[in-house]
UniProtKB/Swiss-Prot annotation:
The lineage of its organism: Bacteria, Pseudomonadati, Pseudomonadota, Gammaproteobacteria, Enterobacterales. Transmembrane segments: none annotated. GO terms for cellular component: outer membrane. NCBIfam families: autotrans_barl. It comes from Escherichia coli (strain K12). InterPro entries: Autotransporte_beta (IPR005546), Autotransporte_beta_dom_sf (IPR036709), Autotransporter_adhesion (IPR051551), OM_autotransptr_brl_dom (IPR006315), Pertactin_virulence_factor (IPR003991). Pfam families: Autotransporter. This is Putative uncharacterized protein YcgI. SUPFAM superfamilies: Autotransporter (SSF103515).
Length: 147
């Protein structure tokens, strides 16, 4: 997979409340052949994605006792996908056109927490909906331990 991703953030009032404007663009090209264990296979000439995104994130930084910090945040963005002709052949049975082009809204909410100078974590949920595409609710969780 080849990916070029550019994201610019503009931070306003970074002390307690923070509003970040977000501009992103991406060009992605994925692999061409997939074979599943149930015998299904797909072949594509090229799977591409070119989009631009404009959004804003609002966060609130809370300093808790014992050196802990928590930062809940909300993000809303609009993404415009330009590629509309990703052709895929599934099981050698004709062509399928994977058209993900158009605008979609992206909505996310999460919380980041620093438990110590070396241990932190995050929890988040997201949803996306737009022309021809709906990404159902998803959740992410992670921890970071640095030493």
């Amino acid at each position: 997979m080849n990916t070029i991703h550019l994201r610019c953030l503009f931070r306003m009032n970074p002390l307690v409340w923070c509003l970040r404007a977000d501009v992103a663009a991406e060009l992605r090209s994925l692999r061409r052949y997939y074979h599943l264990s149930n015998g299904m296979e797909s072949k594509s000439v090229d799977t591409r994605s070119i989009y631009r995104e404009l959004g804003a994130t609002l966060s609130y930084n809370m300093r808790l006792g014992n050196g802990m910090e928590x930062e809940p945040w909300l993000k809303a963005a609009v993404r415009k996908e330009f590629v509309d002709d990703n052709r895929v052949k599934v099981n050698n049975d004709g062509n399928f056109v994977n058209d993900l082009s158009g605008r979609r809204g992206i909505y996310q909410a999460a919380i980041k927490a620093s438990f110590s100078s070396t241990f932190s974590g995050h929890l988040g949920v997201g949803y996306s909906h737009g022309a021809g595409v709906e990404s159902p609710w998803n959740a992410v969780a992670g921890v970071n331990w640095s030493f």
